[in-house]
């Protein structure tokens, strides 16, 4: 809330009208997202719009279609608690037990801060998208940078989600049809399942135009994610001796040299900055204050879930920990197969949210190349453009996922490059460009430190991941 006070003087009347439309009850409606129960009691402060005004009626109807605070939380939590959560034991393996704890606390604070910075930057710049804000302060080069960053993050995420579908759903179906003896039927093979599930479930969901339409699916996805975490926590210690890890070095208890690889994996799990503007503008009666509260709750819950999954998984598997912790369990374990089914369902609903972002990025890039006319943050793709772009993105990402299964390395590279740029470098840098004249050197220092932190993760983690990939030390992740 202190950030709001700092920037309030910079906001003009038009921006407050656009971004904090609500804070008064509309006639005939109840704002179930109000900050307290006293809203509406002071009639002197209530502005009653003219219901005969067509424009006012249109605004009211459009506002009613948007997500409540609860549904916005589900969308944000689902964006955070996505594929990255099952790689958390791998993150602890790379960071060490103490290093992992410090990583969760530090990244939790930083991600929470930069998420709120994005919305504050939107308000200050009077824009509706993350890329629009960056373009406002950095010009066309800035817009292209954030478009490529957002696009590559979402693109890599979509590939990862398809990989996870191949890691989870086949195990469940093979257990149901008793196909775990090595002779796997054609229809139960990994790549066949990826193609079938993506084509007939993820693809239709990806055709949705509005992110609000995914709110109910996001609610079910968040519930399924909680089931997954609890299943790993409870079932892991009950595994037979041969499936568990038994080797712990002294460095595993403290902080390891590969901690930057861990920061990349955790960053991928927590970063959802490319979705932020969409979720903010999908909120009913939106305001920066409400988004601040939403962000605090979502980040706290997400960090707790990630840490619980990370430490419980690493405690069981230790040196045997894989990039996807579910692949460390037997394929015939009934409880884990239920968790795999839940996780596969979670990917089916998270995948369309990434496609939503990716489609917007492609639309903007095509517009910059003059291949699409009149496309900006206030317009939508035509029906034909929507179908062609969505179909291309879904099946290209699906096709790439058929060629690899090293989830840990994929998320490390995405986290080290695009997530660092999108979450740790651009939000504070954009804010500095918008407000630097009104800040003292001490006030600017945290922004500079965050930017340096982002570059450190990008350079060190990427280098370590590429070296390991070249040496082939992560090949065991593909043995499922």
From Swiss-Prot:
The chain crosses the membrane at residues 72-92, 95-115, 145-165, 214-234, 263-283, 297-317, 338-358, 394-414, 447-467. Residues 21-48 are annotated as: Disordered. Residues 37-46 have a biased composition (Polar residues). One of its GO terms (cellular component) is vacuolar membrane. InterPro entries: AA_transpt_TM (IPR013057). GO terms for molecular function: L-amino acid transmembrane transporter activity. It is a multi-pass membrane protein. Its main location: membrane. It comes from the Eukaryota. Keywords: Amino-acid transport, Membrane, Transmembrane, Transmembrane helix, Transport, Vacuole. It is found in: Vacuole membrane. One of its GO terms (biological process) is amino acid transmembrane transport. Belongs to the amino acid/polyamine transporter 2 family. Probable amino acid transporter of unknown specificity. This is Vacuolar amino acid transporter 2. It comes from Saccharomyces cerevisiae (strain ATCC 204508 / S288c). The lineage of its organism: Eukaryota, Fungi, Dikarya, Ascomycota, Saccharomycotina.
């Amino acid at each position: 809330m202190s950030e709001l006070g700092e920037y309030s003087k910079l906001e003009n009347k038009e921006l407050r009208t656009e971004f904090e439309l609500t804070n008064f009850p509309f006639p005939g409606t109840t704002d179930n997202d109000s900050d307290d129960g006293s809203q509406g009691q002071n009639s002197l402060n209530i502005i009653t719009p003219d219901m005969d005004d067509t424009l006012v009626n249109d605004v009211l109807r459009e506002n009613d279609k948007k997500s409540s605070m609860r549904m916005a939380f589900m969308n944000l939590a689902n964006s955070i608690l996505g594929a990255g959560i099952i790689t958390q034991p791998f993150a602890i393996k790379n960071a060490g037990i103490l290093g992992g704890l410090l990583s969760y606390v530090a990244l939790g604070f930083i991600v929470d801060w930069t998420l709120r910075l994005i919305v504050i930057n939107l308000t200050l710049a009077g824009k509706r998208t993350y890329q629009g804000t960056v373009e406002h302060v950095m010009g066309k080069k800035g817009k292209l940078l954030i478009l490529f960053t957002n696009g590559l993050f979402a693109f890599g995420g979509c590939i990862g989600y398809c990989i996870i579908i191949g890691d989870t759903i086949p195990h469940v179906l093979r257990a149901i049809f008793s196909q775990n003896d090595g002779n796997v039927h054609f229809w139960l093979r990994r790549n066949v399942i990826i193609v079938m599930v993506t084509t007939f479930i993820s693809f239709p969901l990806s055709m949705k135009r509005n992110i609000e339409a995914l709110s109910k699916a996001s609610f079910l996805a968040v519930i399924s994610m909680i089931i997954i975490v609890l299943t790993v926590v409870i079932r892991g210690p009950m595994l037979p001796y041969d499936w568990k890890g038994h080797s712990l070095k002294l460095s595993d208890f403290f902080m390891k040299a590969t901690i930057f690889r861990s920061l990349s994996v955790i960053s991928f799990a927590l970063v959802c900055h490319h979705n932020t503007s969409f979720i903010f503008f999908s909120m009913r009666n939106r305001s920066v204050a409400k988004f601040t509260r939403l962000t605090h709750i979502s980040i706290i819950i997400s960090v707790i879930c990630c840490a619980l999954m990370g430490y419980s998984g690493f405690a069981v598997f230790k040196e045997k920990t894989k990039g996807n912790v579910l692949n460390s369990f037997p394929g015939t374990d009934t409880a884990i197969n239920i968790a795999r089914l839940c996780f596969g369902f979670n990917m089916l609903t998270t995948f369309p949210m990434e496609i939503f972002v990716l489609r917007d990025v492609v639309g903007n890039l095509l517009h910059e190349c003059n291949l699409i006319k009149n496309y900006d943050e206030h317009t939508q793709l035509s029906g034909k453009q929507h179908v062609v772009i969505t179909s291309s993105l879904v099946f290209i990402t699906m096709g790439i996922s058929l060629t690899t299964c090293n989830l840990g390395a994929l998320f490390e590279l995405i986290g080290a490059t695009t997530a660092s740029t999108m979450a740790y470098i651009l939000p504070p840098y954009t804010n500095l460009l918008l407000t630097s004249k009104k800040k003292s050197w001490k006030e600017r220092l945290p922004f500079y430190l965050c930017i340096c932190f982002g570059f450190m993760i990008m350079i060190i983690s990427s280098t370590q991941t590429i070296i390991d990939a070249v040496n082939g030390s992560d090949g065991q992740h593909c043995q499922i």
